[in-house]
Amino acid sequence: MVILEAINVSIIPMENKALPADCLVYKHSTTCPVSTTTGQEVRAMKTDLPIYWINVREQRELSNWVAQIYNVVHESPQLLLIRGGKVEKVWSHYEVSRNCFSS
């Protein structure tokens, strides 16, 4: 498993349809300028939760699975806080920042 470079957090590229009960899921578009900015913010977050990173254009099936399993309308960029296996909070577009969540 490759951990993406980050300052204070563990960012794990999502590779299959499995997530822990408590985590963050970041949906990133490699062609979106807003995602470029928010991706930098995610890398600078301070949290004890693992962050699972999905590149939505290249991993459409995983992105759709997350939207379906957690009943969340797909947007990107998008950050989901998952606690106890359920979505507790969702941030989209410029709402995603290093300060939007702290554990």
Give the predicted meaning of each segment:
Residues 12-13, 59-62, 96-98:
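A short acidic, often aromatic-flanked loop/helix-cap motif at beta-alpha or helix-coil junctions
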Residues 34-41, 58, 62, 66:
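Amphipathic alpha-helical interface surfaces
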Residues 75, 80-103:
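Non-catalytic, surface beta->alpha helical segment in thiol-disulfide oxidoreductase systems
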Residues 27, 49-65:
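Thiol-based oxidoreductase modules, predominantly thioredoxin-like and allied folds used
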Residues 14-45:
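Local sequence-structure signature of Cys/Sec-based thiol-disulfide redox active-site neighborhoods
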Residues 69-73:
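Short loop/turn motifs at secondary-structure junctions and domain boundaries
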Residues 1-15:
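N-terminal "domain-start" segment that seeds a small globular fold
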